Amino acid sequence: MNYSNPSQLQAAILDWAGTVVDFGSFAPTQIFVEAFAEFDVQVSIEEARGPMGMGKWDHIRTLCDLPEVAERYRKVFGRTPTDADVTAIYERFMPLQIEKIAEHSALIPGALEVIAKLRGQGIKIGSCSGYPKQVMDKVVTLAATNGYTADHVVATDEVPNGRPWPAQALANVIALGIDDVAACVKIDDTVPGILEGRRAGMWTVALTCSGNALGLTYEGYRALASDTLASERKRIHKLFEASRPHYLIDTIADLPQVIADINQRLARGEMPQGN
């Protein structure tokens, strides 16, 4: 048997919040702030957004490792946060997240149309998230009522290591029956999500305006003056630079042109690992 490069995409692995649902990725961000507040520790929205894309326990651990947050915690408890303290915050985060996830469950404009177009081209729709399964089950149910169902879903606690490790993306490859990771594209609004796709050997598309990096509602994004939007794009492109996404676009609505370009590159023999 001989190896031959794939000639076209077989699967798109989509993130959830900030990619397909919850424009601006507000659901997890606000709950991190509220969970810490229940321990009398202040965390700003900006701080909470920093590690977005990681599994939620790891996200809280990363926040607790910030010198400023660790010092605020020490002033309240007389020590810096241990892993047991992180778990206590996580266990408060979970019910808050489940309770309030519906408030930020709307599909991102253009998502349904783009996903239908991908399926029309024979592309399977995988998905993964920094949410644990308990939260994802509710997110998936809410999305289904709005017309979106992925072919496969992998939550962060269903693999040994979440993002930026490649396990969730690769679990989709296995479940969807894809024969080559180079025939897959990972779409995400966070750096850990892009690193996940890169490390899995996939094409990667960073979404700059619908998710965590811009952090605005759809209406807020649409209302930005052209020079402000250009400045924000430049800032966000720099944030993603080290993770080396193959493409950067505003939102999932811009994805069809990218899919067409990747298929052309595959047909020419190009591979994601070589770019």
From Swiss-Prot:
CC per GO annotation: cytosol
UniProt protein name: Phosphonoacetaldehyde hydrolase
Subunit structure: Homodimer.
SUPFAM superfamilies for this protein: HAD-like
Residues where Mg(2+) binds: D15, A17, D189
Known cofactor(s): Mg(2+)
Family: Belongs to the HAD-like hydrolase superfamily. PhnX family.
